[in-house]
Amino acid sequence: MSMYTTAQLLAANEQKFKFDPLFLRLFFRESYPFTTEKVYLSQIPGLVNMALYVSPIVSGEVIRSRGGSTSEFTPGYVKPKHEVNPQMTLRRLPDEDPQNLADPAYRRRRIIMQNMRDEELAIAQVEEMQAVSAVLKGKYTMTGEAFDPVEVDMGRSAANNITQSGSTEWSKRDKSTYDPTDDIEAYALNASGVVNIIVFDPKGWALFRSFKAVREKLDTRRGSHSELETAVKDLGKAVSYKGMYGDVAIVVYSGQYVENGVKKNFLPDNTMVLGNTQARGLRTYGCIQDADAQRESINASARYPKNWVTTGDPAREFTMIQSAPLMLLADPDEFVSVQLA
């Protein structure tokens, strides 16, 4: 008889964290893989005049004098890699029933697939971080293996990055009498287009909702804005749709990434982002720089997964996924980022 029930075995799952690529799915829907190491912005439809401001980073400092505007760019290259250690196939996997042990061949397949999932997750976190930073700041620092850090600046207007201070701080307002609607409408005027969605982090949402006027105006009913609801529904455990505030959807994002074994939130505390679900975010990718990929005629691709064995005494087996991601906004001023206080 088994030592564990089915429920106990199902519970023996890998540790979860709240990773949910909301910004990628909501704002970055176009994908452009290139057959060249560089990404050419002029080859993306509608971006003929777009250029990035590129600045090397030396010892943590952005060197503006060495930067410049460019319409072609070399993305950072990422390639998370794992070894499939033969010793791992001899040990019981965490979810194996001790009374019904699997054979090493099965464990090897399981380990390979788990490695691939971990590698895909590692790359997806890089992409989401680029997407979030592009929306929040209009720029981000790009890093990769054997790649000097570079700041990618999309040219966000300074007026679109707002920090509340002094008399504008919501935390100092009377929660029973003050109405933050006028503030939001004023912030929205800085956007280059119409604002139809606001994304909060949990603390920012708590501050916003603390106003009596907000609780009275927030419409939590469904059905009146079908297009918006379609865009924001079923977005996962790390995303919560709170309702409509006038003609604007309110969403709370608690997505996380892991850095050096520590879980961190993608959105800083007390963040509010105003945007539009039709904003044109671009997932661009440089070519895969791998001889095996070239032999398989796989050059323009967002991913290149591989599993191989090196001969020797002993032979060793590895898994790896390669990618050269560069998340861009066609118009960084479609978003307004507000640091609440």
Segments predicted by a language model, with ranges:
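Acidic/histidine-enriched, beta-strand-rich ligand/metal-binding domains
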Residues: 170-198, 203-211, 215-219, 225-230, ...
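Long, contiguous amphipathic alpha-helices that act as assembly "spine/axial" helices in icosahedral shell
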Residues: 80-157, 180-183, 187-204, 315-322
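Assembly/oligomerization interface modules of large self-assembling protein complexes
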Residues: 30-98
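Hydrophobic alpha-helical segments and helix pairs
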Residues: 3-20, 147-177
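Sequence/fold signature of self-assembling virion shell proteins
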Residues: 215-341
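Short, Φ-rich (hydrophobic/aromatic) sequence segments
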Residues: 13-14, 182-187, 327
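N-terminal alpha-helical "arm" segments
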Residues: 1-41, 329-341
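Short alpha-helical segments and helix-capping/turn motifs at coil-helix boundaries
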Residues: 25, 182-185, 305
